[in-house]
Amino acid sequence: MRWSRCYIPTLKEAPSDAEVVSHKLLVRAGMIRKLTSGIYTFMPMGLRALNKVAAIVREEMNRAGAQEVLMPMVQPADLWQETGRWEFYGKELLRFRDRNDRDYCLGPTHEEVITDLVRGEVRSYRQLPINLYQIQTKFRDEIRPRFGLMRGREFVMKDAYSFDRDQSGCDESYKAMYAAYQRIFSRLGLRFRAVEADSGSIGGSFSHEFMVLADTGEDTLAVCTACEYAANVERAEVTGTPCTRPAAAALAEVPTPGAHTIEEVSAFLGVPADMLVKTLLFVADGEPVAALVRGDRELNEVKLKNLLGADSLELATPEQVEAWTGAPVGFAGPVGLHGVKRVFADTELKGDAGWIVGANKADTHLREVSLTRDAAIEAYADLRMITASDPCPRCGGAVELPKGIEVGHVFKLGLKYSKSMNATFLDENGKEQVMVMGCYGIGVSRVVASCIEQNNDGDGIVFPPPIAPYEVALLLLDPKNEEAAAKAAEIESFLEAEGHDVLLDDRDERPGVKFKDADLIGSPYQLVLGGKGLARGVVEAKNRRSGEKTELPVEGFAEAFRDWRAGVLKGWGL
């Protein structure tokens, strides 16, 4: 393809609303354009990258035995009402009514639709297992869409759904999809890690997230340096260590005027934060609950929500805090907490040690509080966020906390949807059984952005070869030089015959402009044809990833290019 015929509107500056590097570079490279908040148009170059990701995903899904379908984006409310998600999914589900006053939504996911499809077709165990997938546009009405393609409202996703006779069959389907995901992200040239994860609103008993490793990632991972354990910090277990502090003395009230936070109380009383207990108040499915963690710890709200089995968990408002405790925010504590009947504490707090807690009284705390003696704790559980100082819960080794971007998620759904929607079949004995489900998602458009978050430099995008819109940027420095133009056309034909996508820059622009644009769009292989080089019988080749330049002979170019390209691919681990 000739650049002069392409629509590639590159920009020198990023838009003011672009926060992360992928958003900035996708816009600057002319790959996406914003239509409205969280909704983007894929330009020709961006669509090429998107389609390349989708092609690899499709190949590996087919290889794993899944079959492609295409389901409607518009979904009727009655299916969501069957599973109860119409009420509980929240405002991210965009709902509307048609002219006949029937309720619908734009699908953020398709568990209900696929279950309805399969329950209407499958009658016998002989028809199972089934694994169906689609690559489709989804819509989630994010409250704060941001970061371009990273957290948009409209996005392209691959979602697959497996249906099996029993749990062992579901386990096999899960393994097959897990292996397919490993192949997909390896083929895309991404540095990634599969981690244990919380299943969230999708539900199910077990799941893994596939994370692209990037310093700009929104997620934090807990990764053991000594064994294979890896988990999202939301899921990561913390091994409780017994408290060795002295037993509590007599409880005593202490004034703490104006000290609302752990830091302020710690400074005012001259004690370390690990001698204090945070009392955090929530509303869980309409019911007030309290959660306690040590003052220097962070509560893991996902663990609390799972412990409660709650569909919703929201931090209490200042008005609710005052109504339940009789004190403003910052002075809540577990002793005499009459407005909250359910109180849970992290395992680290179990025992007779004396703690400093809020007194449920303005400007006042309590010293020497024993949770065993002085508070009514319903249960002790692992409620805190893991830190780098905690040991691995599997082997006791050291834990690192790298950042990651979620690009895939695989779930063992079990009977969550099939039971509520009565998706059944007859087994060998003619007995009705409920299908066991799994679901498997990949954010196709998010992969493009995540790839750029992981692979960029000060000059632009550094695409891995499998994702690059054009693998080869062939820069013809002087289009008016007939000899150079002829040689460029010859090289272009050879490369295309070899199966490479080539963008021949034949524009009437200064060489500096061509070099900058080639770096910006991220083609992994750059070839430069200049009059001086051709006079010496060479073509300059640049490895976009390393920046290393070399000269390839015009005579024998084919073999020289193949060898050079093999070296570039090796650097990518491909």
Swiss-Prot record:
EC identifiers of the protein: 6.1.1.15
Catalytic activity: tRNA(Pro) + L-proline + ATP = L-prolyl-tRNA(Pro) + AMP + diphosphate
GO cellular component: cytosol
Keyword Lipid metabolism found: no
PROSITE patterns: AA_TRNA_LIGASE_II
Localization: Cytoplasm
Superkingdom: Bacteria
Family indicated by similarity: Belongs to the class-II aminoacyl-tRNA synthetase family. ProS type 1 subfamily.
Listed HAMAP family: Pro_tRNA_synth_type1
Protein's recorded name: Proline--tRNA ligase
Species: Nitratidesulfovibrio vulgaris (strain ATCC 29579 / DSM 644 / CCUG 34227 / NCIMB 8303 / VKM B-1760 / Hildenborough) (Desulfovibrio vulgaris)
Gene that produces this protein: proS
